[in-house]
From Swiss-Prot:
Lineage: Eukaryota, Metazoa, Chordata, Craniata, Vertebrata
Keyword Cell cycle belongs to the record: yes
TM region positions: none
The protein's name in its UniProt record: Thioredoxin-like protein 4B
Predominant location category: nucleus
Length: 149
């Protein structure tokens, strides 16, 4: 289903999407097209994109073609989903140490829709961090890796 969503293949394209997406949540899915978990997430993203079209713009970003952002957002697990609103990086408290991105696939379409609604409403009120509406048991668990520690 990843063929249904627009792809960003360079740093310049990602920069342009961040700068030009106004009054909507910008969803950037970092991953690889052939990865099974990425395909599962892409299916959820593509099925919800029309329902969320007034609140969100969804793009796929290949981690191998945008190494600058992969390093900047510390994308060590794929898929990782990063959110922006009017050029501002939106953070979400998932109950984990990392609030900068969602790692893994969403369990259901409704989890993704609820998260976008919460980010959108919070951003419209000027918040840069919001509380995740997703049930903690539906959030994938992972260990943070730090270099040289």
């Amino acid at each position: 289903m990843s063929f249904l969503l627009p792809k960003l293949t360079s740093k310049k394209e990602v920069d342009q999407a961040i700068k030009s997406t106004a009054e909507k949540v910008l969803v950037l899915r970092f991953g690889r097209d052939e990865d099974p978990v990425c395909l599962q997430l892409d299916d959820i993203l593509s099925k919800t994109s029309s329902d969320l079209s007034k609140m969100a713009a969804i793009y796929l970003v290949d981690v191998d073609q945008t190494a600058v952002y992969t390093q900047y957002f510390d994308i060590s697990y794929i898929p990782s989903t990063v959110f922006f609103f009017n050029g501002q990086h939106m953070k979400v408290d998932y109950g984990s140490p990392d609030h900068t991105k969602f790692v893994g696939s969403f369990k259901t379409k409704q989890d993704f829709i609820d998260l976008i609604e919460v980010i959108y409403r919070g951003a419209m009120r000027g918040k840069l961090i919001v509380q995740s509406p997703i049930d903690p048991k539906n959030i994938p668990k992972y260990d943070l890796l730090y270099q040289d520690i």
